[in-house]
Amino acid sequence: MGNPESMLLTASRREVLRWGLACGAAGALGPAARALAQQDVAGRDALPGPKLEGLARHPAMFWEKLPDRKVKCTLCPRECEVADVERGYCGVRENQGGEYQTLVYGALCSGNVDPIEKKPLFHYLPGTTAFSIATAGCNIECKFCQNWEISQFRPEQVESTLVTPAQLVRACAGRACPTIAYTYSEPVIFYEYMHDAAALARQQGIGSVMISNGYIQEQPLRQLCRQLTGVKIDFKAFSETFYAQWCSGHLKPVLATLETLKEIGIWTELVVLIIPTLNDSPQEIKAMSKWVVEHLGPDVPLHFTRFHPTYRVTNLPRTPVETLERCRQIALDAGVRYVYAGNVPTHPGENTYCHACRQELIRRVGFQVADNRIRDGKCPRCGAAIPGIWSQEQALAFRPRA
């Protein structure tokens, strides 16, 4: 097989993941390969069903008819106006004769059984697994995307497997996963499949979490949350300039999504990938943290994760641990109760501590839970209620409050 560390210079991400499996664990790899193993990168190991030939067409939701057989997509803030036989910005929704279609209904290009901590979700069924899936496509373009091989390509350019919602739910149940995670690329762009699969999964006692950039309109978000049991939002930065220059998007729609999630009452965690010199200034982190406390409350977990050079941002170094520690302290000082330093295995900032007495409650080693002292959602030392989803019954009992 050769030396994975030296071969990494020319290898694809998928090959690196295969080396990790062949070696038995990420710990058997060199530093560069371990860096990839610490991120929520895509693979195909768990996909059932046949290889897809062509496109997986299905009627799209959330669009309006316009004159001359044009359509207007109302799923995400881009509100693309699409001419006949053209596609929206995401590349996976197409106008056919004045009827809008999704091209990726069940066209899964990634499928893995992951620790829920890999999403990362730290206050949602810790120590359990999530059947994690994705299709090709995205509705923004982050120049630092770790899954760019699937998110920045059209579906016909990516090898996919056709998996119906029923097949997905059966595969998840067969692996004893309590949760399906819609992740890796951007689940908003495969909304119809996620919606239907999550509804079916809930009927079978399986939860669903969306790992998203938050670029979605209010009406589809509210409808989707009737089926979901949790959400993680990748909060790129607290800067309109950053969103415009580095993600081809805008900050305001993401803030609106976060406020809507707060109104709905669904369990939500936030992740900020800290990129040196781009979104790591103390002033920005302080402003972001204050906004979180004022608009979402102090109990929303906030993860600051380590950047590794990838895609179009290879000229910057990986994030210094000291920067993550500084960001974490700024957020704690601003009143966020649960703040994490991510992608730094064995760092104490990856553990969960009681906000009231500072007792260590969950100790993590990488994506594994080494110790969980939370009992019935409470701190065993002082009895403080710890915000989160601590049982499958609690997850499935969620219903939107607004």
What residue spans do the PLM features occupy?
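Conserved Radical SAM active-site core
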Residues: 95-230, 397-402
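Short metal-binding segments enriched for Cys and/or His
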Residues: 384-396
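Conserved AdoMet/S-adenosylmethionine-binding subsite of the radical SAM
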Residues: 162-322, 327
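N-terminal secretory signal peptides and thylakoid transit peptides that target proteins
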Residues: 2-24
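A broadly conserved sequence feature marking short terminus-proximal activation segments
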Residues: 17-65, 88-110, 291-355
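N-terminal [4Fe-4S]-dependent radical SAM core
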Residues: 7-9, 45-72, 78-134, 149-152, ...
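Short linker/helix segments within small regulatory modules
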Residues: 367-374
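Short cysteine-rich clusters marking metal-coordination/redox-active sites
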Residues: 73, 142, 354, 379-382
